[in-house]
Amino acid sequence: MNALAGFSIWAQRNRWIWAAIGVLLLWLVLSVVTNRFSLSSLSGVILSASFLTVVGIGQMFVVTTGRGNIDLSVASVITLSAFVALLTVKGQDANLAIGVVAAILLGLAVGALNSLLVVGLGIPAIIATLATGYVLATATLLSNKALPGFAVSPALKELATGRISGVPIMAIIAVIGVTASSLVLRRTVFGQLLSAVGQNRAAARLAGIRNGPVIASAFIISSVLASLDGLLLGAYIGGAFLEMGQPYLLQSIAAVVLGGTLIFGGSATALGTLFASILLILIVTTMQIVGLPPGAQDIVQGIVVIFVLALAGRQALARRASADLADAGKNPTERTDVQAVQARPK
């Protein structure tokens, strides 16, 4: 019983473990039920999950800012970035630097726009980023008309599909991104500010923290990573098409929350985002093996997202209630005064 209690306490601090356990269990089930799973097939799953991890890390920073903030423009950013890469790189390695700069500038512009809408104008993040996504969708249609053909830079193609000693290069990029994000969250001032703002904006403001720049930085990080992800994803599939980023909208949110990042903000885990991305790709792979049609697959993924969000919401409310009780216990006089005021006849 003591060991179980100790593991429970440890798991609360390392919430990524549940996604990791889910990956292990689902992989074992698939290996037993089918004879088609091996280390090579796992490598393919990890490759697909790497693209989701990159955009999921950016989504994680936005969710960490609290108040239910999510970035719904990532799907449109991914798609538009793939088209911009084709238009700027034109299949030549000599133009690769121009394509990378264009992707970064696109991410910075979209992130700045989202920040202006959310921080400057006070529009809820869901509405603001959804509106931005519609604007980007129009720009994507215009880019599609201007696209002369599909030609991918060989160097970019190698980066997106190549392997080093059997390990996908994209997986290495994803691990580097997860490691860097973990260091930012745990070892830097920005990570501490981000957690403080996500936990309690009023308290952070009283502590002298400028909430606006911190929240704006999170949206910019999300857009830049989504744009770079679109650049690599376009090279991976060998072109670009409308709605190519759409699957990453719900999946990026699910990967963040399923990985252990609190939906109400204040605490994030980049490692959990990585494991949850692998788990979600395994779920999709399982549905494809079963033979579910695409529509049914979307329904199952939607149910998974709803279940995870509902569970995360209940856990957050439970933590908040426990914190309120703890605060009341620490300040019995204040609690009595509040109760007296509420009981006073009007």
What are these regions (language model features)?
Residues 28-30, 34, 39-91, 121, ...:
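Single transmembrane alpha-helix segments in multi-pass membrane proteins
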Residues 121, 125-187, 214-217, 236-245, ...:
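Transmembrane helix-bundle core of multi-pass membrane transporters
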Residues 1-56, 92-98, 344-346:
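Membrane-interfacial amphipathic/re-entrant helices at transmembrane-helix boundaries
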Residues 226, 236-302:
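Transmembrane alpha-helical segments in multi-pass inner-membrane proteins
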